[in-house]
Amino acid sequence: MAVRRDTICALASGPPPSAISVIRVSGPDTRSIIRSCLSVETLRPRHAHLVDIVASDGALIDTGLATYMAEPASYTGEDTLEISIHGGRIVTELTLKSLMENGARLAEPGEFTRRAFEAGKLDLTRAEAIADLIEAETEAQHKQALEQMDGAIEALDSN
């Protein structure tokens, strides 16, 4: 029996303030969230769209770029939305609040990658390599993580 997943959201970029905040949404309610939180009814998959991001009461939060990836052609294998907005603290907080008020919950650390692994989008070696790449602090660590990712890709291609 398949388990129905909930929809998750999280800041995918560095913490504000910054020039841009990137927020990711993934799960079964993504299309509903697009209709509720953005100034459009639908988004063409894999294209960037200039949209208004709105609060639950319809108030404008920001204008940004939104990209929708339809399942299964996304990182997690689920419907996924990425929103690039101005990277101020309040803009980021209000955007996350609107997403959560419209059906998403805040993702746990690593949850997007866990979902990708569970969907067969990547193997454990590649998932670990992604974590190593994110955590790399030296050029040697960076190089090792990239080599680990290349090895994981080659192993997947040979199957």
What kind of feature is each model-predicted range?
Residues 1-143, 147, 151-154:
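A glycine-rich (often HGG/GG-containing) alpha/beta subdomain
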